[in-house]
Amino acid sequence: QHSIEWFRKRLGNFTGSQIGLLMKKGRSDYFSDTAKTYIYQVASERDMNPEIINDDVEFEKYLHQVCVNTKAMQWGTDQEENARELYERLTGRHIVETGSCKHPAIEHFASSPDGYYYDEETGEKGCLEIKCPIQSTFMKYKSEIHNNASLLDVKFEYFYQCMAHMMCTGAQWTDFVIYNPFQSNPIHIVRILPDEAVFAEMEKRIRVADDIVKELIEAE
């Protein structure tokens, strides 16, 4: 993840990390103002000059303009591998890293789990979503997040990110993992399960948003 090719593959797609934005309704409109801004962003990506996309130097300039990367975000990214290794030791599961996974049926929808698990004998498939927050946030999540409902309540965008992973990979679960190496018990694992009603609502809103993107591009 986070390589230049990874960013290229995500371009113009509705992605797991942002999909929660589409799930917020406006007071009078189908989409909230935040959702509309995201739709405009996806439309702009899909309508980008291909010469810019395919030129590494120019595309790097573009990424520098659009990507926010705070110290806290970079620290979280740097800690992901440690979180994955500890998860493997605790669960005995072998986790592989994966890139952007496109949904098999919903056009322009993709998600990038922080890890993927597959058991060849049983066919069991699972995903990881790893967050490495500061200590106060770690304690908040550890005390308040225990299942689907509480994740939706505490951090709705992470809930929809976990759902997107399962939709795009066909996984039977996503383990939502929070990690902070400074704590005496540095990892908290919450099993998030698929919800077909949520999947259906997500698909509906993604398809409506995608139609708007196509209209925006064709209107030029």
Each model region followed by its residue ranges:
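Charged, glycine-rich intrinsically disordered N-terminal tails and low-complexity linkers that flank
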Residues: 1-78, 86, 144-152
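Residue-level preference for nonpolar/small residues embedded in alpha-helices
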Residues: 79-80, 157
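Nucleic-acid nuclease catalytic cores
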Residues: 86-218
